Amino acid sequence: VNYRNHRKIVVIDGIVAYMGGMNLGQEYIDGGKRFASWRDTHMRIVGDACNLIQNVFVCDWHNAGGRDLDNLMDNGSSLMQELFPSSTTDKYLPMQIISSGPDSKWDSIQKIYSKMIADAKESIYIESPYFVPDDGFLHDLENAALSGINVNLMITGKPDKLVAWWVAQTYFETLLKAGVNIYLYESGFLHSKFCAIDGR
């Protein structure tokens, strides 16, 4: 069982957050010795959504055996106000933060992907370096393509993990027959995990 934490979260003063695929290290900026470049997606978030991202971090910290926050986290504590300050932004864009992990009994991310794909009206764009879907996700993509949705999948053309890359290719024939467009990113290593549905 793999219980490692693969999240990439930075929260600054409880009001600015960064999350996405970027690791910390020079090779993740310029590709290092193995790749000409490293393509990734990371987001900067400002506002109330930072509280939700901070909550994910605090739960991970607690579950990993970090400082016991239970006694410090009552609503009036200074630590609570420091970790979860009120937003000062006047701009608003609806956003939902979703996390999954061994601390949750629900596969929240998998469920939201299935729902979004099922609700797609025009297009689905997915980027992933390691495309190893379960049967349900594979069928979701096939059904979307067969129903006329423009489904596009991009994976890395220059892998860092050959086994995962070979496994991904075993799904190509089935997806192509269903009408999914598949692209290989050849300009360097594609590490981005990204999905856009109907341009959103």
Predicted regions: what is each one?
Residues 1-200:
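Charged, low-complexity intrinsically disordered terminal segments
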